[in-house]
Curated annotation (Swiss-Prot):
Amino-acid positions noted as binding ATP in the UniProt annotation, renumbered to this chain: 301-308
Pfam families linked to this entry: CTE_SPB4 (PF13959), DEAD (PF00270), Helicase_C (PF00271)
Family listed: Belongs to the DEAD box helicase family. DDX31/DBP7 subfamily.
Motif annotated as DEAD box, chain positions: 417-420
Reaction catalyzed: ATP + H2O = ADP + phosphate + H(+)
GO CC annotation: nucleolus
Domain of life: Eukaryota
Protein name per the record: ATP-dependent RNA helicase dbp7
């Protein structure tokens, strides 16, 4: 009720009633501008603090640390707006200093020497000239910046996003989502930074303060804001007894080479010279079939089970039987067998095994023809005569078309080794042509003096997997083939008797192989691989040889240079005075592919590094493989999938798949480099958190126990074991290693370009997984910024550009200058090796004929004259 007694349904407060100003007349734009000006004037006058507002400011009680101001709520107090001409605060306790000339209270920042800004946080000690309290950063040597307790960087000038610091340059240093404070110099006091990453963050920010960052670069933390695993897996149960090897030789009671139908001469040679007492299961099944029957065969067996001898022994045995029947066999008696392999390395290895077997019969001659070798030398060997030929499809097709001395009329065996790989590499058309040409030129009649040889040409197809392309290859080459595989295990026999059907598997790994996987975020990939290798070679004899599989050649070059570099003096390095480093091969061929692994070595166990990829010259690849196989010292080979197929590398204990394979079959062949012939072996694959964890199900499909046969690791566990230390000291060591590697790459244009090439090639290779696995290895899920850190890069992904992907061709003058510098002994310019794409382009150019432009023009004129009539020549008519 109002004062005059009138009854109202609303209440009028004490606020004075102000008439609402109306704007009329003129254009609507002018009215709108006048309205905004009036509103701004009213807002400015109402925001001016009064004495009542100042003294009613929320207060903090230092004794109880409880909010006692007006209208207490759970929200944090907001920042108080202060005018430019206002320099004192009221209502604060004794620990809050008032603004005075040149003195700032705790939690305040002097920005530009004029405006004062406070964050109204817990009382802190005021800045003293020349001394900074914990959590402070002196920027530019003049301005002092106080960091909030929440860990946000102060706004020194302009507008900086949270987690950024302006170091006096034009650009801000971003910590990639890091919001914790840093200590620029000195040591961190205990408990000065929230969380458990104080040591690691200190190392990052010391790197910035010491000038290790250039404008536009990003120095990020390793152990923060990494994606976590989204799936939980049961720990594998401990096996009561170790698994029985599935590819081991049989016991002498079960089978001997003599019982398989081999002659005493060959069986004695295998047992005495080659130290082979008994065959494997697949050798037992194959030799018995191929010695006594002339039908085609498909040999399927897991990797490392001895498929090479499974088809070589029957061929050699039947040729030996021919010579024992009174027929004189020599090198010009004819070509009896052709063996096709997909790669040059496998071709060389088959030839090496054949050479060992033929030592018992030196009159039988075998040789090889493959790409990368001199055609003239191969023609000379073929002209002398050969009985068994090991070849790659492309080079054999070339010789069949252009080499007249290659007579395939007497060929009785055609072996297609690694049939799935032959089809994947695109040799289908070459194999079709080879089969047709051999069929047309072969002798149909059976000679009486060759009774022990097959009456018809026998085709043998070998593969560890049964895929659609292998079946298509079988349709091309096989006729009424016999499927040969090892005898089933006792467990499989029992399941079959009980009516349990065998599970369809994408691949079958040896049972004695210990398979594990590691969930590693992209940022931690490099330090995790380093820690894993350090741990593997920590003690002498723990691991003899290891293979690291990487997806592309440029990445192989980068990691080889990284692990073989000379570390900084502050790092843990091998003391050459305390330990004798193993001698490296003196051959000029391998000086760029073999080096000391200083990063992963220690004083008690030095390691030798090897690298191998398809862009290397053939003679270099052969020499590197030979050095790795024959080395008696601990060694690591960093390679692409060129070393994953068929190569029998002795004493390989550990296989690391740093980059996931492009298909499940590639994984089978990779891990098949270890756990061979019944020996134990370990394999570990790197997977990133998220969708890549679905690949664990594919890994488990290769084992009878499924996921129980797999062991799970985390990046933190592997890094802690590799770098060691007390407590969480391993984090600081890993961070120091990462920063050191980044400095190493930034200090040299050569290594920086190698890192960028490796990064870009890795991304291109990541997009080439098979279609049915592309949802697991999805490019959209890849964090390019975190992945760049794994290549020691500080650039943003969008600014990583590789100069010289297609460099200009070297002129004659440039070559002359380089030759003169080399003659004077001057050091050549430090450049990165050519990228993988450039090397492939040069290989294509090598196959093109070199044609002079003037000569081509002259030929064209002569050709035109031949087709011109006399009338047209003299412009008649």
């Amino acid at each position: 009720m109002a004062d005059d007694g009138m009854l109202m349904n609303f209440e009028i407060g004490d606020v004075p009633i102000v008439a609402k100003q109306a704007f009329k007349g003129g254009r609507w734009k002018d009215r709108l501008a006048a309205k905004k000006t009036a509103q701004h004037r009213v807002t400015k006058s109402t925001n001016k603090p009064s004495a009542r507002e100042i003294f009613s400011e929320p207060q903090h009680d230092t004794s109880a640390e409880e909010y006692i101001g007006r209208e207490a709520s759970s929200r944090a107090p907001k920042r108080q707006r202060v005018d430019d001409n206002y320099n004192s605060y009221g209502g604060r306790n004794e620990n809050t200093a008032a603004y005075a000339s040149g003195k700032l209270p705790s939690g305040s920042i002097n920005v530009g020497g004029g405006r004062k800004t406070t964050f109204q946080e817990e009382p802190r000690t005021a800045f003293v000239a020349g001394k900074l309290p914990p959590g402070s950063i002196n920027i530019g040597g003049k301005k002092a910046t106080q960091i909030e307790d929440e860990g946000r960087a102060a706004y020194a000038s302009g507008k900086l996003p949270p987690g950024s610091i302006n170091s006096g340059a034009k650009k801000a240093i971003s910590f990639q989502d890091e919001t914790r404070p840093a200590y620029v110099s000195g040591k961190l006091p205990h408990g000065s930074i929230d969380g458990m990453r104080n040591r690691e963050m200190a190392a990052v920010h010391r790197e910035i303060a010491e000038g290790g960052r250039k404008p536009g670069q990003v120095v990020s933390s390793l152990f923060t804001f990494n994606p976590t695993s989204k799936k939980t897996f049961d720990e594998p149960e401990e096996q009561a007894e170790p698994a029985k090897p599935s590819n081991a030789p049989l016991t002498e009671e079960m089978a001997t080479f003599t019982n398989l139908g081999l002659s005493r001469r060959l069986a004695a040679h295998l047992s005495t010279k080659l130290d082979m007492k008994a065959p494997t299961a697949i050798q037992k099944a194959s030799v018995q079939q191929l010695v006594s029957d002339d039908s085609d065969a498909f040999i399927q067996a897991e990797t490392g089970s001895g498929k090479t001898l499974a088809y070589l022994l029957p061929i050699v045995e039947r040729i030996l039987a021919l010579s024992e029947n009174g027929v004189q066999i020599h090198r010009d008696s004819g070509l009896f067998a052709i063996i096709l392999s997909p790669t040059r390395e496998l071709c060389k290895q088959i030839a090496a095994v054949l050479e060992k077997v033929l030592r018992c019969a030196p009159w039988i001659v075998g040789t090889t023809v493959n790409g990368g070798e001199s055609k003239q030398s191969e023609k000379a060997r073929l002209r002398k005569g050969v009985n068994i030929l090991v070849a790659t499809p492309g080079r054999l097709a070339d010789h069949l078309d252009n080499t007249e001395v290659l007579n395939v009329a007497t060929v009785r065996w055609l072996v297609l080794d690694e049939g799935d790989r032959l089809m994947e590499l695109g040799f289908e058309e070459e194999i079709k042509g080879i089969v047709e040409k051999i069929g047309r030129r072969s002798v149909a009649k059976a000679n009486s003096d060759m009774g022990s040889l097959p009456k018809r040409r026998v085709t043998i197809l070998c593969s560890a997997t049964m895929k659609m392309n292998v079946q298509r290859l079988g349709e091309i080459s096989l006729k009424d083939a016999v499927h040969i595989q090892a005898d089933p295990s006792e467990q499989e026999k029992q399941d079959k008797e009980n009516g349990v059907e065998a599970q369809d598997k994408a691949f079958s790994a040896p049972t004695q192989l210990k398979q594990s996987y590691a969930i590693v975020p992209a940022k931690l990939r490099l330090v995790t691989l380093t820690a894993l290798l350090k741990r593997a070679f920590a003690r002498k004899g723990s691991v003899m040889k290891a293979i690291v599989f990487i997806s592309c050649a440029d990445s192989v070059d980068f990691h080889f240079s990284l692990f073989s570099r000379t570390p900084e003096a502050s790092a843990e390095v091998v003391d050459e005075e305390k330990v004798d480093l193993p001698a490296l091969p003196k051959s000029e061929l391998v000086k760029e592919t073999i080096a000391h692994g200083t990063t992963i070595s220690n004083n008690s166990n030095p390691v030798i590094l090897h690298k191998l990829h398809g862009s290397l010259a053939q003679n270099i690849r052969t020499a590197t493989l030979k050095a790795f196989s024959e080395s008696a010292d601990p060694c690591v080979m960093i390679c692409t999938d060129v070393a994953s197929r068929g190569l029998d590398l002795p004493n390989v204990d550990f296989v690391i798949e740093y980059d996931p394979p492009f298909s499940a079959e590639d994984h089978l062949h990779r891990v098949g480099r270890t756990a061979r012939a019944g020996r134990e072996g370990r394999a570990l694959i790197f997977l990133m958190p998220g969708v890549e964890e679905e690949y664990v199900s594919i890994l488990a499909s290769g084992y009878r126990e499924g996921k129980k046969a797999l062991t799970r690791h985390t990046a933190e566990d592997l890094i802690q074991k590799g770098f060691g230390g007390i407590g969480r000291e391993w984090e600081e060591r890993a961070t120091n290693f990462q920063l050191e590697v980044e400095r190493w790459s930034l200090d040299s244009p050569k290594y920086l370009e190698m890192a960028r090439r490796g990064y870009q090639s890795h991304i291109r290779a990541y997009a080439t997984h098979v279609a049915n696995e592309r949802h697991i290895f999805n490019m959209q899920e890849l964090h390019l910024g975190h992945l760049a850190k794994a290549f020691a890069l500080r650039d943003k992904p969008g600014s990583i550009k590789v100069p010289g992907l297609r460099p200009a061709k070297m002129t004659k003058a440039d070559r002359s200058v380089a030759a003169r510098k080399a003659k004077r002994g001057e050091k050549a310019e430090d450049k990165a090796p050519e990228g993988e794409r450039v090397r492939k382009q040069k290989k294509m150019e090598l196959d093109l004929p070199t044609v002079d432009g003037n000569e081509a023009a002259a030929r064209m004129k002569r050709k035109m004259k031949e087709h011109m009539a006399a009338a047209s020549e003299f412009n008649i008519g």
